[in-house]
Amino acid sequence: MRFNETLEKIKTYEAGKPIELVVREFGIEPQNIIKLASNENPYGTSPKVVDAVREIADTMYMYPDDSMFELKSALAKRFEIDQKNIIIGAGSDQVLEFCARAVLNEKSSVLMSKITFAMYEIYALQQGAKIIRSSCYRHDLEEFYDLYKKHHPDIIHICTPNNPTGDALDAEYLYSFLDNVQEPLVIVDGAYMEYAAFKDEKKRIHPQDLIKKYPNVIYLGTFSKAYGLGGMRVGYGIADQSVIGQLYKLRPPFNITTLSLKAATTALEDEGFVQYSIEQNFLQMERFVNFALQNGFEFIDSYTNFITYLLPENRKSKSLSEALLKRGVIVRDLTGYGMNALRITVGTKEQNDRFFEIFKEVLNEY
């Protein structure tokens, strides 16, 4: 059997370990496991969303509204744009895939940060494209511009706030870069934008401003993080109609379920839940910062719902993450990104209490 030879260059993406896997591997009861690896909203889902989904549960036998009118209307109102500027994906990573398939081929190249969301590379390699990386995990846009002029990439990825590091760009800094980049498709991934904008208004990217001024830019958002809908898989892209029209040619029919559409639409209506989740996140974030300072860890100032601990040479992130896992604490080891670091989702007070207690035990042993 013959497979596409481009697959030989691709590593399988490894998502954060689910609670069920830890139950099977270590025999730990689910209630004794805390998952701080996938940057889900630890406060769950808005009760209004849960009620709305229950109300339509008996319609699951019917295909969803493929026009996605209600959700697009809600997004259009939120961002003061036309519905024709919006495409909905099964998570924003599906929109990423549409972009890669629409633009790239074996003669293409893609520019991204040295350390950033792994799916950018995977989708590019699936199309046979070449990867160009900056020299630093931060988005040094002066270096990005130099690489753009040298290599003329077909897609430029800018993740702000960046995953898995948590740092974010000032909006004006990004706009000054975009002013000088007209040819490639620039993908601005704002999966954690709700958090960044709360912490520092200068970090807020307004997608309506992007599409008015930059027809070659697409902004990505998601309901998986602040809105607490990771299990429903809903994301969106906002761009000039000329871009959205091309991406629609790649969208399969009925790619978003009825329940997911209702959940996302209702989530947009409950800003109180989102605001509460974000406020609590940054209150708890202070504890992670203080813990790092007390234990001599470096960390990256985070504009998200996670923090990245940069560990000293004598402490290996792989060993620490495995030790935590055996005790029922799931965090993300960043060895695969070339970093001796742990990415830790900021949980609830109770989850964090337990994390710090167990992490102290692990640090005393390793």
UniProtKB/Swiss-Prot annotation:
Pathway: Amino-acid biosynthesis; L-histidine biosynthesis; L-histidine from 5-phospho-alpha-D-ribose 1-diphosphate: step 7/9. InterPro entries: Aminotrans_II_pyridoxalP_BS, Aminotransferase_I/II_large, HisP_aminotrans, HistidinolP_aminotransfase, PyrdxlP-dep_Trfase, PyrdxlP-dep_Trfase_major, PyrdxlP-dep_Trfase_small. GO terms for biological process: L-histidine biosynthetic process. The keyword Transferase applies. It is an enzyme of class 2 (transferase). CDD domains: AAT_like. The modification N6-(pyridoxal phosphate)lysine is found at residue 225. Coiled coil: none annotated. GO terms for molecular function: histidinol-phosphate transaminase activity; pyridoxal phosphate binding. Keywords: Amino-acid biosynthesis, Aminotransferase, Histidine biosynthesis, Pyridoxal phosphate, Transferase. Its EC number is 2.6.1.9. The keyword Acetylation does not apply. NCBIfam families: hisC (TIGR01141). This is Histidinol-phosphate aminotransferase.
